[in-house]
Amino acid sequence: MSLGRLLRRASSKASDLLTLTPGGSGSGSPSVLDGEIIYSKNNVCVHPPEGLQGLGEHHPGYLCLYMEKDEMLGATLILAWVPNSRIQRQDEEALRYITPESSPVRKAPRPRGRRTRSSGASHQPSPTELRPTLTPKDEDILVVAQSVPDRMLASPAPEDEEKLAQGLGVDGAQPASQPACSPSGILSTVSPQDVTEEGREPRPEAGEEDGSLELSAEGVSRDSSFDSDSDTFSSPFCLSPISAALAESRGSVFLESDSSPPSSSDAGLRFPDSNGLLQTPRWDEPQRVCALEQICGVFRVDLGHMRSLRLFFSDEACTSGQLVVASRESQYKVFHFHHGGLDKLSDVFQQWKYCTEMQLKDQQVAPDKTCMQFSIRRPKLPSSETHPEESMYKRLGVSAWLNHLNELGQVEEEYKLRKAIFFGGIDVSIRGEVWPFLLRYYSHESTSEEREALRLQKRKEYSEIQQKRLSMTPEEHRAFWRNVQFTVDKDVVRTDRNNQFFRGEDNPNVESMRRILLNYAVYNPAVGYSQGMSDLVAPILAEVLDESDTFWCFVGLMQNTIFVSSPRDEDMEKQLLYLRELLRLTHVRFYQHLVSLGEDGLQMLFCHRWLLLCFKREFPEAEALRIWEACWAHYQTDYFHLFICVAIVAIYGDDVIEQQLATDQMLLHFGNLAMHMNGELVLRKARSLLYQFRLLPRIPCSLHDLCKLCGSGMWDSGSMPAVECTGHHPGSESCPYGGTVEMPSPKSLREGKKGPKTPQDGFGFRR
């Protein structure tokens, strides 16, 4: 069969699968029964917040989607997730969430007793059992139902038995409260009555069929089986291992009522808000365990009544990533697909979205009664949107770093070094040695001996600053405690606590960070301390590993880098002015949406945290530090962090435009993206934006200083594009940058009557 026919057939099957009128349309075509599982995947992780990660970062579980009747929509999708730990101990209250009451598996007749093996006779497989078996793999499993009369035994292949058991968290020796594997490899439940007096569970004999799962097979053509390479469906026409266990488990007792409220984990996990990360209280051990059981416990929601579903792919193959489910009360649940399967889930959601839209048109159901938003983000950029030198530089390693040092220890070819760091970053093993150069604590012309002498001198100065702080008068100390120390003491104990370097009670590294921040407030009282500075100091201390050196690196960061946490309003306003102009130049549609929102939209509240905390809370630490290094390299601009902001908007801001989000919704949209954006993708896009900006033959005078301070590098002169005046210079008759105002032609004047001239008319920018 050709690939086109295969995909069309797969699409047809998906339409049958997701028909919003369970029970069929009477045309004889196959349909999905109420409660039918249509997607399942094991080892889908839930990650607890920082305060609970000491009890384990990864909490894998079993996730499935199944159909359920809905009075308003006809049918809806139910998402259920059960932690592997509860499956392992056969927690029936938890298992009922992934095999609902209406499921045909639940309604299937169960054997009342064990079938004893005939003495001296071994079980011989019947011709029916010799048919090709369907293997539930540890990869993603999509279950497609068919109405068929024949019976067929479905079991894993022998080589997959151990893999299946491990994927479900089943050990070789099973205690009585855990599931066991039958010879066919299907998980089965052992009731307390089946346990022997010695406390050991009896192993099923070869002739026992108690742990087997029977599926109907008649009418299923060979063409209905989709290859895993089709990127559409995998493992069709089979029930999941958990459903198999529940189908034949005679010891299981299910509650017949399905009206219990959703798991308390709905309210247990909130996404980071616009002002900071989730502020997790400090629990004692019993409270931590209880909170963990709530957050990482059974989770079940009706996807048809959620606010949004978002899929974030994190790998180039677009199989792994995160699923973020948001309720209408703006509560979030994040599921991590570390081992693939997210692409298949995306196929299911897209088909469901299409069917739902068709159903809404037919029944005229209000859109606000269903899932309002659905989006997919894939980490790919077209080749036309990448810097031409993107793949030419590798990460700066030890050997490459040593090649830049001469015999005296001086850094040679500084421009090439900064360019290499801009494109490739720095290896973790040498960050502590290279960062002081980027932060201008060390001069590139300094020798090794001069740097050692500088360290001794700066250590003495640091000691004097600390002594000045400790020798304050009582009145000075009270004022200092009220204005600085109180906030510092509150912040340092919750900064980067998931980092091993700062983890644990009475950690001396936390005290070092505290002293650095307090001493900096004494060293620079005009700046003092503002919330967020601890987020900047912590990574530097963890890499430099010396309190005095870290202090002076932080001083260099605050003095010589625009990419800092600044408490002054005028600095933030300057950053926002540049960012608005960049968006006007590079992303016209988004800028026009901001203008349509008025002054609130142009304030761009969604990006304030990006600028104040240097993206520390928007990306995982490894990616955030890569962004820091690219900004510290000062390659071709001192404002590369603004290009990072534009890149985020360009990649993740389409939903804002398409859905015409208001200011508060836009703030929520970008806040929800925290820790789910692809840092490498954003970096590549930002480098491309900078490259295209440098190619512009003319720029608005409002962006004249964007690339002025970084120097010309190896060239005799810097970039000198023509400057076009924007005309916004109150109190000045002429443009201070020598910009010229282009006189419009009569033709453009006639066109101007039809509407205002957009930035896109004045500046050509290759997207």
UniProtKB/Swiss-Prot annotation:
Residues 425-635 form the Rab-GAP TBC domain. InterPro entries: Rab-GAP-TBC_dom, Rab-GAP_TBC_sf. Residues 107-117 have a biased composition (Basic residues). Residues 175-194 have a biased composition (Polar residues). Keywords: GTPase activation. Residues 93-138, 169-228, 729-767 are annotated as: Disordered. GO terms for molecular function: GTPase activator activity. GO terms for cellular component: cytosol; early endosome. Residues 197-206 have a biased composition (Basic and acidic residues). It comes from the Eukaryota. Transmembrane segments: none annotated. One of its GO terms (biological process) is regulation of receptor recycling. May act as a GTPase-activating protein for Rab family protein(s). This is TBC1 domain family member 16. The lineage of its organism: Eukaryota, Metazoa, Chordata, Craniata, Vertebrata.
